[in-house]
Amino acid sequence: MDDPHASLFDALFRQVLDGPGESTPEARRAAARNLDVPPDLQPLVAKIHKHAYTVTDQDVARLQATYGDDRMFEIIVSAALGASRKRLMAGLAALEDA
């Protein structure tokens, strides 16, 4: 099934992952894919990908001193965007197979 909003989602994805920011595009792409994430960020990024509703203030606070507000925000948004894309693709594939 074709996603009528694919071009908009792709533009959003490119801007968030490759646009200007405090974190590197490589770090944002890694968070979006949940691959090659720095070890200290891995638990948070994995949690966002698998069970985002369980992320706590403490999860973020542990990394705040190292990464700061802007970089943390960018990593969290990138991870959430990557997780949402995986779910969208799975849903569209399920509709295609139905």
Located regions from the model:
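Hydrophobic alpha-helical segments
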Residues: 1-98
